[in-house]
UniProtKB/Swiss-Prot annotation:
<protein>
    <recommendedName>
        <fullName>Iron(3+)-hydroxamate-binding protein YxeB</fullName>
    </recommendedName>
</protein>
<feature type="domain" description="Fe/B12 periplasmic-binding">
    <location>
        <begin position="58"/>
        <end position="316"/>
    </location>
</feature>
<keyword id="KW-0406">Ion transport</keyword>
<dbReference type="GO" id="GO:1901678">
    <property type="term" value="P:iron coordination entity transport"/>
</dbReference>
<comment type="subunit">
    <text>The complex is composed of an ATP-binding protein (FhuC), two transmembrane proteins (FhuB and FhuG) and a solute-binding protein (FhuD or YxeB).</text>
</comment>
<dbReference type="GO" id="GO:0045121">
    <property type="term" value="C:membrane raft"/>
</dbReference>
<comment type="function">
    <text>Part of the ABC transporter complex FhuCBGD involved in iron(3+)-hydroxamate import. Binds the iron(3+)-hydroxamate complex and transfers it to the membrane-bound permease. Partially required for the transport of desferrioxamine.</text>
</comment>
<feature type="signal peptide">
    <location>
        <begin position="1"/>
        <end position="20"/>
    </location>
</feature>
<dbReference type="InterPro" id="IPR051313">
    <property type="entry name" value="Bact_iron-sidero_bind"/>
</dbReference>
<feature type="compositionally biased region" description="Low complexity">
    <location>
        <begin position="24"/>
        <end position="33"/>
    </location>
</feature>
<dbReference type="Pfam" id="PF01497">
    <property type="entry name" value="Peripla_BP_2"/>
</dbReference>
<keyword id="KW-0564">Palmitate</keyword>
<dbReference type="GO" id="GO:0030288">
    <property type="term" value="C:outer membrane-bounded periplasmic space"/>
</dbReference>
<feature type="lipid moiety-binding region" description="N-palmitoyl cysteine">
    <location>
        <position position="21"/>
    </location>
</feature>
<keyword id="KW-0732">Signal</keyword>
<keyword id="KW-0408">Iron</keyword>
<dbReference type="InterPro" id="IPR002491">
    <property type="entry name" value="ABC_transptr_periplasmic_BD"/>
</dbReference>
Length: 321
């Protein structure tokens, strides 16, 4: 009888101990849950204030993969065009293609905590999935502004500073390399030939190597391009007859020929107007790969600095022969 009473007493004490432990664990779990709650902040975007995660962990974008990756952000989905960029391919291995324009359904599947877009199509639907920041085309004017802006959006200001320190170091080294192979008064132009036979001249912030040439390397544009194109922040289509007015000592041309079937560049190069350009006569025309020179995200611009520097040095050596 005494043994039974003793056993019952021990059982009661055991149950009380388990209950107490359970209560403590429950409180701890509740505390952990509270600490894991996402910290939010207000971001002042060009389109108004947006409440976004202070440190987003899953970002989807249509156009800004390179900008976000440059500051170490975790991009889980990106627009289709990003995957054509040779400088981003290795960084996009685990990133999902969400289409172009981006598919609301594909974005939803990725469960992002932040969406960053240039294109406002379907933006109201995207806002229902996650906080959505709209950054219009040409909001930032150079690499430094771009990196600073996306470092802020991604809660990665330290990474942004680190990227810019490396970028500026590279740009200064590149300037020293080319100083001995180009004349200090030489002019540089950025152009594009299309499969439709259009010929465009570009500014310092429209891709095609403009940021690398004018901003990073500090090279000069002809006065005509400076006044009519760069200062106006525009691209300008040129008729063949006026190309000489916008010609530079060095001409970088992207050839937009997506199907590889267009002969418009051949036609241009065989024209008397083209053959009489000083850049052509002195072998200072560079035909550049469209996919490599179209983008102007910080990672791509950094790579373009390397390519352009190497091209100028190599061509100078060739022209000595």
């Amino acid at each position: 009888m005494k043994k039974n009473i003793l056993l019952v007493g021990m059982l009661v004490l055991l149950l009380m101990f388990v209950s107490a432990c359970s209560g403590t664990a429950s409180k701890g779990s509740s505390s952990d849950s509270a600490s894991e709650k996402t910290e939010m902040r207000t971001y002042k975007s060009p389109k108004g204030n947006v409440n976004i995660p202070a440190h987003p962990k899953r970002i989807v974008t249509d156009f800004y993969a390179g900008e976000l990756l440059s500051v170490g952000a975790n991009v889980v989905g990106s627009g289709s065009w990003s995957f054509d960029n040779p400088f981003l391919k290795s960084k996009l291995k685990n990133v999902k293609d969400v289409g172009d324009p981006i598919s609301v359904e594909k974005v939803m599947e990725l469960q992002p905590d932040l969406i960053v877009v240039m294109n406002e199509e379907n933006v109201d639907k995207l806002k229902k999935i996650a906080p959505t920041v709209v950054i219009p085309y040409n909001t930032a004017k150079n690499v430094e502004d771009t990196v600073s802006m996306f470092g802020d959006i991604a809660g990665a200001k330290d990474q942004a500073k680190s990227f810019m320190a490396d970028f500026n170091k590279k740009a200064e080294a590149a300037k020293k390399k080319i100083a001995g192979v180009i004349d200090k008064d030489a002019t540089f132009g950025i152009y594009e030939n299309t499969d439709k036979g259009e010929f465009w001249v570009f500014n310092d912030n429209g891709g095609r190597g403009g940021q690398a040439v004018y901003n990073a390397l500090g090279l000069k544009a002809p006065e005509k391009i400076e006044q009519d194109v760069i200062k106006k922040g525009e691209m300008k289509q040129l008729s063949q007859e006026v190309i000489p007015e916008y010609a530079a000592d060095y001409m970088f041309i992207t050839d937009y020929n997506p199907k590889g079937e267009s002969k418009t560049l051949d036609k241009l190069e065989n024209s008397s107007i083209w053959k009489n350009l000083d850049a052509v006569k002195h072998n200072r025309v560079f035909i550049n790969d469209f996919d490599s020179f179209y983008p102007y995200d910080p990672i791509s611009v950094s790579k373009q600095v390397d390519i352009i520097t190497d091209m100028l040095i190599k061509r100078a050596e060739e022209n000595k022969k």
